[in-house]
Regions:
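Terminal amphipathic alpha-helical/low-complexity segments used for targeting or macromolecular assembly
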Residues: 1-74, 182-186
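Left-handed beta-helix
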Residues: 74, 80, 85-86, 91-100, ...
């Protein structure tokens, strides 16, 4: 979803930072953004997306500058072309990368060290449905991948194919312990 009007931007801030059930207040918004890294990152991310959708070189330049600032301060690289619906949550805004050809549905939770994207720029977009909860250290890489609605993705999962609705996805990891070989063993 593209943020094209200031009213839409304000509605996103209201939903994601203040909570939809609470009355909107600029003072509360400013206070929460100042005190919480997740809210601060969301505030500036949404502002950069809004500026990116506006016509003109000045607003595009401002959007790019804000986006670079998020990358420097938090390590969050959510490209300006990514389409992200309401309800994004960045619990620990550190080392999160989302490429421009990604569409994320409503109420998505991205945790630290998550990468969502494709190898080539011309690939089909990756689509995440509504209510997707992504664990820490996950990679979703490929072309035309669709993650369904109400999906939970376990920590350290690697996804390169579609995931259906209403499932929990984990990547099995087998641990093997081998004794070290010394020169005496050889």
């Amino acid at each position: 979803m593209m943020l094209t009007t200031f009213a839409e931007l304000k509605a996103f801030w209201h939903y994601e930072i203040l909570g939809e059930d609470k009355r909107f207040s600029w003072r509360k918004l400013r206070r929460r953004v100042a005190r919480n890294n997740s809210y601060n990152c969301l505030f500036w991310l949404r502002l950069s997306q809004y500026l990116h959708s506006r016509p003109g070189r000045t607003t595009l330049s401002m959007a790019k500058r804000i986006n670079k600032g998020l990358a420097r301060k938090y390590g969050v690289e959510i490209m300006l072309g990514a389409q992200i619906d309401k309800g994004l949550w960045l619990g620990h805004p550190t080392a999160i990368t989302v490429y421009s050809g990604v569409r994320i549905g409503r109420d998505c939770n991205l945790r630290q060290c998550t990468t969502i994207g494709s190898v080539e720029a011309n690939n089909k977009p990756i689509e995440l449905g509504h209510n997707v909860d992504i664990g820490a250290h996950c990679c979703i890489i490929g072309s035309g991948i669709r993650i369904g609605n109400n999906v939970r993705i376990g920590a350290m999962s690697f996804i390169n194919k579609d995931v259906p609705d209403d499932v929990t996805y984990i990547t099995r990891k087998d641990n093997h312990i081998y004794p070290n070989r010394t020169q005496h063993d050889a």
